[in-house]
């Protein structure tokens, strides 16, 4: 009887030999290692992808911040260009500042000169005490006004108004088309131009505000 016939007569032995002839443990172990390696690679890949996503997100934030800074710088540059165009050049700006400084000095000088003239005017005027305070009576102008008081009732009314103004410290400087306001609290003089562009309401409000200081 051949070996094949013996195996067929004993199938259990036959299956045992067949199983032993196929040693798949190494293959199973190899597949496990491969599966493990694949899992490791997958985890590392996901970690790298997450890290790259974080870098991209951070880069986007920095990019947006840079865009905002660039927009601000562009706005500043445009404003600077407009200012440069307005003043022309640095030398022109310096010249303008010097001119303004000179103008300010001239105004201060004129103000001081006017104050001196006003002090001289007050010096040549008579100070009359009244129950309500003191008033200024000009020695030179009053006689001329009194002569004019006999002309017409309207002129007399205007003269009375001028006397009232003068008693309050308001003097009409018709020669220079302006009003001089003597502030009693500090002795300084305020000037109100008799400009037609100014309303009577504004002129009256300005005078009373100065008299109240």
Swiss-Prot record:
Its main location: nucleus. The modification N-acetylserine is found at residue 2. It comes from the Eukaryota. One of its GO terms (biological process) is cell division. SUPFAM superfamilies: Kinetochore globular domain. Gene3D superfamilies: 3.30.160.430. Component of the NDC80 complex, which consists of TID3/NDC80, NUF2, SPC24 and SPC25. The NDC80 complex is formed by two subcomplexes, TID3/NDC80-NUF2 and SPC24-SPC25, which are joined end-to-end through their coiled-coil domains. It has a rod-like structure with a length of 570 Angstroms and globular domains at either end. The TID3/NDC80-NUF2 globular domains are probably directed to microtubules, the SPC24-SPC25 globular domains to the centromere. Can also interact with MPS2. Acts as a component of the essential kinetochore-associated NDC80 complex, which is involved in chromosome segregation and spindle checkpoint activity. Present with 1750 molecules/cell in log phase SD medium. This is Kinetochore protein SPC24. It comes from Saccharomyces cerevisiae (strain ATCC 204508 / S288c) (Baker's yeast). The lineage of its organism: Eukaryota, Fungi, Dikarya, Ascomycota, Saccharomycotina.
């Amino acid at each position: 009887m051949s070996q094949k016939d013996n195996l067929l007569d004993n199938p259990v032995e036959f299956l045992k030999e067949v199983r032993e002839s196929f040693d798949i443990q190494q293959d199973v172990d190899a597949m496990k290692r491969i599966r493990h390696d694949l899992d490791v690679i997958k985890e590392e890949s996901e970690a790298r992808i997450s890290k790259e996503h974080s870098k991209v997100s951070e880069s986007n934030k920095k990019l947006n911040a840079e865009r905002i800074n660039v927009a601000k710088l562009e706005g500043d540059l445009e404003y600077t260009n407009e200012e440069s165009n307005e003043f022309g050049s640095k030398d022109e700006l310096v010249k303008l500042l010097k001119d303004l400084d000179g103008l300010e000095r001239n105004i201060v000088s004129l103000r001081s000169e006017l104050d001196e003239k006003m002090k001289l005017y007050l010096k040549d005027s008579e100070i009359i005490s009244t129950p309500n305070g003191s008033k200024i009576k000009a020695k030179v102008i009053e006689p001329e006004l009194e002569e004019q008081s006999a002309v017409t009732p309207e002129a007399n009314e205007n003269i009375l108004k001028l006397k009232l103004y003068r008693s309050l410290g308001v003097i009409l400087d018709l020669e220079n088309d302006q009003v001089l306001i003597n502030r009693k609290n500090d002795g300084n003089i305020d000037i109100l131009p008799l400009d037609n562009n100014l309303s009577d309401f504004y002129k009256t409000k300005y005078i009373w505000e100065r008299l109240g200081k």
